[in-house]
Curated annotation (Swiss-Prot):
InterPro entries: UPF0060. The keyword Membrane applies. It is found in: Cell inner membrane. This is UPF0060 membrane protein SG1469. It comes from Sodalis glossinidius (strain morsitans). Belongs to the UPF0060 family.
Amino acid sequence: MTKTVLLYIATAVAAILGCYLPYCYVKRDGSLLLIPAALSLIAFVGLLVLYPAASGRVYAAYGGVYILTAFLWLRFIDGIKLSPPGLSGRGGGIVRGRDHDRRLAPRRGLRGAESGVDLAGFACGCPTRRSH
């Protein structure tokens, strides 16, 4: 159990760092930051392979750890003070699932299978086309 939690934390930190360093590169013109950013994203992918099982429960648990890690990153790395109203705002609605109707709603007039879009791809933000 402890190994799995540490794996989730390491994966979350690698993912956040892999996105944060390119942000710093763009905002602060630090060209050397792209190398550790690439290494961090490679580590992120490598850590995902180590997960004990590819099931919904595993990824849901990782998602919770990722969100907690992101809040800790905001507080201690970005220096943003977190308050209860801030934690229960838009992000809190997504965490509690209240936002699912807006995020997963089909686009105008398209209904899942009729549109030729595989809705399973929406979980990663990359819908795929089915061949007919």
